[in-house]
Amino acid sequence: MDLPEHLAERCRWLSDQTVPVGDGPVIVWLKSLFRTHENPAVDVGRWMAHHHDRPLLIYHGLDERYPHASLRHHNAVMDAAVDLHRGFKKQGLRYVFHLAREGHRPSVMKRLAGQASMIVTDLFPLPPWTDWVRSVADMADGPVVEVDGHCVIPMPLYGRSVDRPFKFRNATKKLRKQRLQR
């Protein structure tokens, strides 16, 4: 059973497996897509959980030990956590938020990787997030997939970088028009 095209084109698989393994939940690990509607990572997780008869858990964590961490950013993330909790609750989805703090820093994703039948996360192709995702993928028994929810033309679909905005605009005109007319 394949994902619908509009979701499949946004996926970058970090393993050869593309279906959940075992009976554990499908975990959606949110790192940067803090919205409850039109969130392709959550949509992929919901679709996989539903079609493979697995529970769904949406996980969101915050730890201050990363480059350029700031109070302003953390306030925005924690405000988003409140909105996510309310929004996912209205949709009947299980959402958990973990705030790491001194004296309480369990390796939540390591633990979830051992329980999950599959991990879905938002594609954020910058360090240290790329390293974190690779580390979790190496621990996980089931498949791990990154889903682009930031771009109209998904990064896995276009797949290359350009040095000028007009070059990208011209190269993706047809793809952009197709997606906007869906």
Model-derived features with residue positions:
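Active-site "lid/cap" and pocket-lining segments within catalytic core domains
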Residues: 1-182
